[in-house]
Every structure is written in structure tokens, then in C-alpha cells.
């Protein structure tokens, strides 16, 4: 079972890294789009809103779910630690604490991914509201 620890860590941290890179890429693309878009040229507010909010749900989903992914890594790490202790029959405090500390880093990583994603989502949603206000002002709304 000890051989599963690197696989669990790689999977959890790999998923979190992938999600964070995807979120940053989407945020950069959206910021570039918001700078270039002219809301006054849209005939429909619904079409503008659809274009402005495209892929923002990915960032909010990453923000809300990355702590759970980290928590899953922590739970699996704790399970592996206790399984190893049960299999060896040794109650060495050092190995218990080391195993638990390593398991908790997954939760920390999930939170580290979530916090910037929440901030990015808030900034991008604010830009959407600004562009929609531009549309409303241009179309007498």
C-alpha cells in the first residue's frame, strides 16, 4: 500500500495543477477579450452576455471544487498512513506525524488553487457587469 502514496500524490497534485493552469489561461483569454470587445456593436444584450460569460463557469467550478480535491488527497493519504501502521504493527509517532503532515499538504494545495480562482472569478464577473452597463447605456437601457 505504501507504493500507492506517490500515485495518489501525483494524481491529486496533477489534477490541481491542470485545473489551475486552465483557469489562468481562461482568465487571460477573457481579459484580452474584454479589452477588445465593443459592447455598443452588439444588437442583443443576451448575445453580449453569452459572449462575455463564456467559460467563466470553469473558473468558478475550479474555485469551488479544488479544496475538495485537496481534501480527497488528504483523506487518501491518512488512509494510507493508517493502513501502513496497521500492516506493520508499529506505533512510531514519527512515522504517524510524517504521514499526516504529508497528507495535509493536499488540502493546502487545494486551498492555494481555490483562493486565486475566486479572486479571478470576481474580477472577471465585474468586467462582465461593466460591459453590460456599456451596452445598456449605448442602447438606452
Residue ranges of each PLM-predicted region?
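Cytoplasmic juxtamembrane regions at transmembrane-helix boundaries
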Residues: 129-141
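Hydrophobic alpha-helical transmembrane segments of small proteolipidic membrane proteins, enriched
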Residues: 1-40, 46-132
Amino acid at each position: 500500500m505504501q507504493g500507492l502514496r506517490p500515485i495518489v500524490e501525483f494524481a491529486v497534485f496533477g489534477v490541481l495543477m491542470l485545473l489551475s493552469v486552465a483557469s489562468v489561461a481562461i482568465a487571460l483569454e477573457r481579459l484580452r477579450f474584454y479589452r477588445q470587445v465593443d459592447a455598443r456593436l452588439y444588437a442583443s444584450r443576451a448575445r453580449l452576455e453569452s459572449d462575455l460569460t463564456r467559460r467563466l463557469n470553469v473558473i468558478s467550478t475550479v474555485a469551488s471544487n479544488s479544496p475538495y480535491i485537496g481534501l480527497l488527497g488528504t483523506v487518501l493519504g491518512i488512509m494510507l498512513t493508517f493502513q501502513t501502521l496497521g500492516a506493520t504493527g508499529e506505533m512510531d509517532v514519527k512515522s504517524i506525524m510524517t504521514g499526516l503532515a504529508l497528507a495535509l499538504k493536499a488540502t493546502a494545495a487545494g486551498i492555494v488553487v481555490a483562493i486565486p480562482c475566486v479572486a479571478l472569478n470576481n474580477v472577471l464577473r465585474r468586467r462582465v457587469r461593466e460591459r453590460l452597463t456599456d451596452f445598456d447605456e449605448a442602447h438606452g437601457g
